[in-house]
Amino acid sequence: MRVTVSIIKADVGGFPGHAHVHPKMLEYAAAKLKEAQKRGVIIDYFVYNVGDDISLLMTHTKGEDNKDIHGLAWETFKEVTDQIAKRFKLYGAGQDLLKDAFSGNIRGMGPQVAEMEFEERPSEPIIAFAADKTEPGAFNLPLYKMFADPFTTAGLVIDPSMHEGFIFEVLDVVEHKVYLLKTPEDAYSLLGLIGTTGRYIIRKVFRRADGAPAAANSVERLSLIAGRYVGKDDPVLLVRAQSGLPAVGEVLEAFAHPHLVHGWMRGSHAGPLMPARFISVDPERRIAIGPKMTRFDGPPKVGALGFQLHEGYLEGGVDLFDDPAFDYVRQTAAQIADYIRRMGPFQPHRLPPEEMEYTALPKILAKVKPYPADQYEKDRKKYIEAVVKGAKVEESQHD
């Protein structure tokens, strides 16, 4: 059976602030998707959150970028915004919905999208990841570890079906170019690109032996769409596992080190990506309530739900980070967060200028008047005296 798995995610209101979502939002979204399932639009679904973002996991046979599936997601997010978020005056109601009306494809309209179409195998494990308070490039390092690092994925060495390696599809989100790199031989070139996480983002991974899709990552950059800061992108990631692909445990091993990512408070700080537990997972209701974002609106967190796909139906989910094996990782992330928070507004905790241009910082800096250095150096005393007296140096004196 040929099946498509789609994850479409949006922040349509925080409760309170940017910490979490209102439970009624998840319930409304699940009811909306259940109705679509009854109409035959989708085969199955699951609704979950990480922080203040709602993810809609849907299976169907309509292929990627399908207007019916994207339209269903858009309509669901709009109704959740209008019926729940605005009624309860939730923070940032509808903030990821950057357009007024749906135009056939949800890409470029604000929500994050990760989709894969493939032939369902005799056993089809899939893992749906979602991260909050970070950007799509946050998954670059884990994806590299899963599919190109033999110290993470032993199958690259000992599984003949994986030994040929993988093909990485990398998107340059600034110049809108696509790179296709093969591992292991292109590994150094690949790292040269994806180490710049804000620009070069791994969008897809394919098995090199037969071109089978292995992973799909969302790549929408909200600030590049809106031209202003409207919240961090908060990506979603879909990974297939086992039988010629990394095992479930190898996929999860990629998150065993809480690497630094961009985002966190006001989308302006670097912090550790913490693999977090879900508060509750209810397969019967098709809802999972994810972790809250607390300290400094974070730290950045990622959740993982595992499913077995059968004839397009989702068996699960299983909270894959809900295990003592990840307790030490979480503790390490907390220690890293504590260390880097002590740097306050200084880099490298605060992001570099090019990452700050879509925040409110340029407006703050515009209020601070600089002086030409050559003029200032000639008569420093005059400038200092003017500041002491609360006076302004005349424009003609330094222009």
Swiss-Prot record:
Task: Give the Gene Ontology MF terms in alphabetical order.
Answer: fructose 1,6-bisphosphate 1-phosphatase activity; fructose-bisphosphate aldolase activity; magnesium ion binding
Which amino acid positions bind Mg(2+) 2, per UniProt?
A: D52, D53, D132, D234
The protein's annotated catalytic reaction(s) are: beta-D-fructose 1,6-bisphosphate + H2O = beta-D-fructose 6-phosphate + phosphate; beta-D-fructose 1,6-bisphosphate = D-glyceraldehyde 3-phosphate + dihydroxyacetone phosphate
Alphabetized Gene3D superfamilies for the sequence: 6.10.250.1180
Pfam families attached to this UniProt entry? FBPase_3
EC numbers? 3.1.3.11, 4.1.2.13
Q: Where does dihydroxyacetone phosphate bind?
A: H18, K133, R266, D297
Required co-factors? Mg(2+)
Q: Ribosomal protein: is it a keyword of this entry?
A: no
Copy the domain comment. Consists of a single catalytic domain, but remodels its active-site architecture via a large structural change to exhibit dual activities.
Question: Into which family does the record put it?
Answer: Belongs to the FBP aldolase/phosphatase family.
What is the protein's given name?
A: Fructose-1,6-bisphosphate aldolase/phosphatase
The species this protein was found in: Pyrobaculum neutrophilum (strain DSM 2338 / JCM 9278 / NBRC 100436 / V24Sta) (Thermoproteus neutrophilus)
